[in-house]
Every structure is written in C-alpha cells, then in structure tokens.
Amino acid sequence: DYDIAGAATGVVDASKLLGPERVTDGDVVIAMASSGLHSNGYSLVRSVVSRVGASLESHVAEFGRTLGEELLEPTRLYTRLCLDLVERFGVGGIHAYSHVTGGGLAANLSRVLPQGAIATVDRSTWTVPAVFDWVRRGGDVTWVGMEDSLNLGVGMVAVVSASVASEVLSAINEAGVAAWVLGSVTSAGADGTVAGFGSVSDLSADSSGVRLISGTKGVQAGAVLLHGEYRVG
C-alpha cells in the first residue's frame, strides 16, 4: 500500500495578499457549497461503513445513487473562481478566503480573522447534504462532533466588503457554484458582549447551541460564533 500526497506553491505580489489584516467589522461572510466530503473525514466514514455493515455497491435512496458513488464524489476545486473574484473585485472587495478542510467550518474560518474579530455564522442558512447526516446517524455522532470534523456542505468561505457582497454572491452563483450569506464580522463591545448574544465569556458554555470557536489548529486569531440549528437534506 502507498500513500500519495501532492502540494502546490503559489506566488503573489505582496500588495495583493489577502488575510486577517484586510478583514474589518461589517464584512460579509459568504459560503460556497462543497460537492460532498471533500477528501476529509474518511477515517470516520470508514468506521461508520464498517459499523453499519453497509455495502459500497448498495443503492441509497436519499443519495439517488450507490453509497460508493456518493462517498467518492470528486472534491470541488475553487481555484479559478477565487482568482476570478479577486481579479474582478480587487483586494478592496475580497478580504480573505478560508478553505474548509479537516476541523470543520469554524476552525478554518477563525484562522483568517484578526484577533478580536468574531464572525457570526447561522447554521440555518443552508441545508446540510444528506451524506453528512448519514455519517452522523450511522456513527452516532453529535452535531458538535460533526461540525468540528467535516465541512457539512460548505467547501470555501469568502470574507468580503459589504459594499460588494451582493455582486460577489451573483458572480459565484453564475459560475455554477451555490453560494449564500453565512453571517458577518463583528467584535465584542467594551463590556465584553456581542450584540444579540451576550457576554463572550459565557458563550463557550452556552446550552442553546451557541458556540464560540477560537484558537484552533495552533493559531491565535479571530473567533467564529456558531448559532441556529442545522437543516438536513
């Protein structure tokens, strides 16, 4: 058996670099749909397949195809689309991108935010594809465990200026990739509260499903506030 890995290195002018230093309060957080599992979480998936005794050749009605075909759906690539958006809207419009890989949406998005910034993400703004709910049910995994591991239908996130958000949404959808507004960027007030959610210090222990995620993957940057309930396809 062999493990095969590939990597690519890009070069960009310093004046065109995106990242936390460009993100500001009021920026809009836009999701781009994933095509499926995106090559992440397959250790969990394999354990679920084994646990439920599923055959990869079996037809799954909720997928409309076999289990194997669903699990092996090719990963959507966003390279050309992301480059085109920067070319069209510039670094004044596109402030940061976050590729949602292992660790889930919040862990990856928080790393492209500046310290002190909080991106509010509403879970109810999209429908989680059926394959993720199949994994959740088959593995008896909580939604917290799922959102800390898999992309749940969001493959790429763009943090953009509010002034161009509607145009960016249209451009992504016109390129054939479903896109929607996840939320926006804000920051805690001087009293340590986030408008509509209360004290930051209380959010990590919130029992209503509100979670504040920060300091992930060894990076001390911004934070992501998850709220709302998932809709399942």
Question: Model-derived features: where do they sit?
Answer:
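Glycine-rich anion-binding loops of enzyme active sites
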Residues: D1-S43, S184-T186, E229
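Acidic, glycine-rich loop-and-beta core segments that form the ion-binding/anion-interacting portion
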Residues: V23-L71
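Glycine-/charge-enriched secondary-structure boundary and capping motifs
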Residues: D1-Y2, E62-L72, R76-G233
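Amphipathic, positively biased hydrophobic alpha-helical segments used for protein targeting
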Residues: E21, L37, V52, L113-Q115, ...
